[in-house]
Regions:
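Small beta-barrel nucleic-acid-binding modules, primarily SNase/OB-fold domains
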Residues: 2-6, 13-16, 23-174
Length: 174
């Protein structure tokens, strides 16, 4: 081989390696393990390599623990996945370091199932799956789960109102 051809082959290998590494960074992990804890209606702990990994169900937002339907939502998620082996298709991490992902129990999309049962809202700020909106509409139309309340408060509104009340109380205390 000529010197020029050897250099061209080396350059091609470098480019291939760089491309491979770039695409590897885009791939997300898949976690598999039993669910060992249910934090609330959209957060679970999955045991992976003997370590609990906190997983936030992507694209949905369940009622907060102290919010109406918070306990029921947590219970519904527990009935679906507690002590079951699940697969998590990771889509990223949140600011708290939790894995964000879609949880599967066999072929069942647990995130979608929570919306279908009226146990969670579509998290509009982050949702990309348009099918979730239709599931939410159907749950609402059938008054399923939290939609039994004619005017349910979304978790993001609940959190905002709680922050505002807290700030008002701090200002009043000064």
């Amino acid at each position: 081989m000529t010197k020029t051809r050897v250099e061209a082959v080396k350059a091609a290998r470098v480019w291939c390696l760089a491309a491979l590494l770039a695409f590897a960074g885009l791939a997300h992990a898949e976690l598999v393990g039993p669910v060992v804890a249910i934090q609330d209606g959209d957060t679970i702990d999955v045991l992976v390599n003997r370590q609990p990994v906190r997983v936030r169900l992507a694209q949905i937002d369940a009622p907060e623990k102290r919010q109406a339907f918070g306990t029921r939502s947590r219970q519904a998620l527990a009935e679906l996945v507690f002590r079951q082996s699940v697969r998590v298709a990771e889509t990223g991490r949140d600011r708290y370091g939790r894995v964000i992902g879609t949880v599967y129990l066999g072929n069942v999309d647990v995130n979608a199932q929570m919306v279908r049962e009226g146990m969670a809202w579509v998290y509009r700020q982050y949702a990309k799956d348009r099918g979730l909106y239709e599931l939410e509409r159907q749950a609402q139309a059938s008054s399923g789960g939290l939609w039994v309340d004619p005017e349910p408060v979304s978790p993001w509104e609940y959190r905002r109102d709680k922050r505002e009340r807290s700030l008002a109380a701090k200002r009043q205390a000064q």
